[in-house]
């Protein structure tokens, strides 16, 4: 993940502050396997499919502690791996898990990447666009560092999609899922699939494949996860209520994490889905890039 670290972020109607140097918010720990039959494995599998036949230099923007890059070391050892993130703490963890220095990590903001133009054959983002203050600028940077003909693959939680649990709860005061995700994980953009496709296409990134995940079960999983985080963050909530929230959320969280994987492998439609996996190719023609 990446955003403007420790600065106030204007989300449209209020100022919001999120700390990416908090160890509790670091993403990307551990490693992934394609056979673990969960939502993280689904993202990895779809990414690997998107990159079949591509070689050279790969950059992951918003790499966190490096989970996806470590997985690529196993599944795609032929690639030269690079990662950047805005969090010093996340990169410190990534480097600690990179003793031989085979992955090149850099501190960098998605809105101002520390790389030359046309440097990478592949660029990846997982759960990044919803964190940045300017989605178009982040897409500009992707297009800038990606070589013509190169592949861009991303996963975006498009929580503004219609006919989803998130759309039903959009203005809910009882279950304000959008506020919970903003406060606890830094989601400051509520995007839609069409918005993302349009933003990428206008920057010369031709969308060649779009698939979907996080259908109903995945969203139920999310709601209970962030409800628990909200309850546990309140100092005035009694301990017994916090314990109850943990028990209830775990009872939902554990089965839905795996059941959602099977749901997403069966359901191909965009109906009721908020998870969007996009694969693009950078056009060769300089004139293809539109503002």
Language-model regions, residue ranges each:
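Conserved N-terminal segment of class I S-adenosyl-L-methionine
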Residues: 1-116, 122, 139, 212, ...
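A short SAM/SAH-binding and catalytic strip from SAM-dependent methyltransferases
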Residues: 122-133
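Active-site beta-alpha loop architecture of Rossmann-like, nucleotide-cofactor-dependent enzymes
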Residues: 68, 130, 159
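S-adenosyl-L-methionine-dependent methyltransferase catalytic module, highlighting the catalytic core
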Residues: 6-39, 97, 133-141, 151-281
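Short, cationic motifs built from Arg/Lys/His that form the positively charged side of catalytic pockets
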Residues: 144-147
């Amino acid at each position: 993940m990446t955003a403007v670290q420790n600065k106030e972020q204007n989300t449209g109607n209020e100022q919001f502050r999120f700390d990416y140097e908090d160890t509790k918010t670091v993403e990307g720990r551990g490693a992934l396997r394609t056979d673990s039959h969960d939502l993280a494995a689904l993202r990895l599998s779809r990414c690997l499919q998107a990159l079949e036949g591509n070689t050279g230099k790969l950059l992951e923007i918003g790499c966190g502690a490096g989970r996806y890059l470590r997985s690529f070391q196993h599944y795609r050892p032929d690639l030269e791996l690079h990662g950047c993130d805005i969090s010093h703490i996340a990169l410190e963890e990534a480097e600690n898990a990179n003793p031989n220095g085979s992955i090149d990590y850099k501190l960098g903001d998605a809105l101002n990447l520390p790389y030359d133009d046309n440097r990478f054959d592949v660029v990846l983002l997982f759960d990044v666009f919803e964190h940045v203050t300017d989605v178009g600028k982040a897409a500009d940077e992707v297009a800038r560092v990606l070589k013509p003909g190169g592949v861009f693959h991303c996963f975006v939680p498009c929580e503004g999609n219609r006919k989803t649990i998130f759309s039903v709860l959009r203005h809910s005061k009882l279950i304000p899922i959008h506020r919970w995700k903003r406060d606890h994980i830094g989601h400051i953009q509520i995007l839609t699939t069409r918005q993302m496709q349009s933003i990428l296409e206008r920057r010369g990134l031709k969308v060649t494949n779009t698939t979907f995940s996080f259908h109903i079960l995945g969203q139920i999983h999310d709601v209970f996860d962030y409800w628990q985080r909200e309850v546990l963050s309140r100092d005035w909530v009694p301990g017994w209520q916090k314990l109850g929230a943990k028990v209830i959320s775990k009872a939902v969280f554990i089965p839905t994490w795996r059941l959602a994987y099977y749901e997403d492998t069966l359901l191909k439609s965009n109906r009721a889905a908020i998870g969007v996996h996009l694969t693009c190719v950078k056009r060769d023609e300089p004139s293809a890039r539109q503002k």
